Amino acid sequence: MTINEIQDNVIEEFSAFDDWMDKYSLLIDLGNSLPALDERYKTESNLIEGCQSRVWLQADYVDGKIIFQGESDAVIVKGIVSLIIIVLSGHTPQEILDADLYFIEKIGLKEHLSPTRSNGLVAMVKQMHLYAVAFRAKEM
């Protein structure tokens, strides 16, 4: 699936709920379904700066695609991590760099987050882009 197809699926899944409490429950469920990050990846270098909660993001380059893993110590943030990983993991560096992450706006995520969580979301996406830039440079 393309990044846009995945985003469209996410939008459809979130649009099934009118109430943001239900959407938060969906985020929590997504976070609970995120595989635990191996302790060896919970390092300072994998810690995302700009997040109020502790968020770790690990990226591996496998067969030309970036595989992301992540975790957070906060349940809603862990759901956000899971959501971003669902959309971007398993794609090439160029696909990630070219992606317009419109689902964030369409599901209303950014406007329903506190300013610090919103900043954390931006920091997570920025870090994923930095990984994509680094892995793309290795391709050349």
Segments from the language model and where they lie:
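Glycine-rich phosphate/pyrophosphate-binding loops
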Residues: G90-I107
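Alpha-helical support elements that line or immediately flank enzyme active sites
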Residues: V81-H91
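Short, hydrophobic/aromatic-rich beta-strand segments within well-structured domains
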Residues: W56-Q58, L83
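N-terminal intrinsically disordered, cationic/polar leader segments
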Residues: I3-I11, A16-R54, Y61-V62, I104-M140
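Mobile acidic interaction elements
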Residues: Q7-S15, D60-S72, G79, D98
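Residue-level signal for short amphipathic helical patches enriched in basic/charged
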Residues: V75, H91, T116
